[in-house]
């Protein structure tokens, strides 16, 4: 895999997966353009950072216009919720679609015109293995990630003949501090290490994956 000379937008960059993907992009010679709602003061010194609300379509368009040339988009921003599907409430339901779907939609709306103008680009989204089939306690989360997966397929069908590859990874549980805290009785050795998932994401953003379109790639670890 080689991302040399490629400018890659990474949303959710300040999170556990975002940090791993940023490190992988840099290791493969790419230039990360880091996006999140806010960044710690000492986060990724020397890298280009853009702090704004991805659910705000107008703000997203303004910030993407400032980024200049974009070769790849990695939509990592997202959130997770567990609870009875009948009892999540409007706020919880809306939050899952705002964080998992609206963030992706606003970035795609801003970035795809740039890629179409240059005749090339890659987009990698993050779905979920838990959304392939309905799971107990994951109603709103699974529904929102199902939208991500269907959007990935639709975007691929629309853009593949225009030089743009659109694919998604479908991880099981990612080994992050937050997940370890939320699931203290689980065995994290069976989860997906962020660095391993980052390598798959970077592969899909590389020229080595040029022939891959609309794939939903399971990354399950040992779970």
Regions found by a protein language model. Give the residues of each.
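Substrate-binding pocket helix/loop in short-chain dehydrogenase/reductase
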Residues: 84-85, 92-97
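Active-site helix of classical SDR
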Residues: 108, 144
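Active-site loop immediately N-terminal to the catalytic Tyr-X3-Lys motif
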Residues: 86, 133-139, 161-162, 190
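Conserved NAD(P)H cofactor-binding loop of Rossmann-fold oxidoreductase domains
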Residues: 76-82
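C-terminal helical subdomain
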Residues: 161, 168, 176, 186-223
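Residue(s) in the substrate-gating loop at a strand-loop-helix junction
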Residues: 128
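Active-site-adjacent segment of SDR/Rossmann-fold oxidoreductases
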Residues: 133, 154-164, 210
């Amino acid at each position: 895999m080689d991302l040399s000379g490629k400018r890659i937008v990474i949303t959710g960059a300040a999170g556990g997966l975002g940090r791993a993907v940023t490190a992988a992009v840099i290791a493969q010679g790419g230039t990360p353009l880091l996006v999140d709602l806010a960044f710690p003061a000492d986060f990724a010194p020397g890298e280009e950072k853009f702090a704004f609300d991805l659910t705000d379509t107008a703000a997203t368009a303004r910030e993407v216009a400032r980024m200049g040339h974009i070769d790849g988009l990695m939509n990592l921003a997202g959130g997770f919720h567990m609870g009875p599907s009948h009892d999540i409430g409007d706020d919880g339901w809306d939050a899952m679609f705002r964080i998992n779907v609206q963030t992706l939609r606003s970035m795609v709306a801003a970035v795809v015109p740039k890629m179409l103008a240059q005749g090339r680009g890659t987009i990698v989204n993050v779905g979920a293995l838990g959304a392939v089939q309905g799971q107990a306690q994951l109603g709103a989360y699974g529904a929102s990630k199902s939208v991500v997966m269907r959007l990935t397929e639709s975007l691929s069908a629309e853009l593949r003949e225009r030089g743009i590859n659109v694919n998604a990874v479908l991880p099981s549980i990612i080994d992050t501090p937050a997940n370890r805290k939320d699931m203290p009785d689980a065995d994290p050795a069976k989860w997906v290490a962020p660095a391993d998932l980052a390598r798959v994401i970077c592969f899909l953003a590389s020229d080595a994956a040029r022939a891959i379109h609309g794939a939903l790639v399971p990354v399950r670890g040992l779970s």
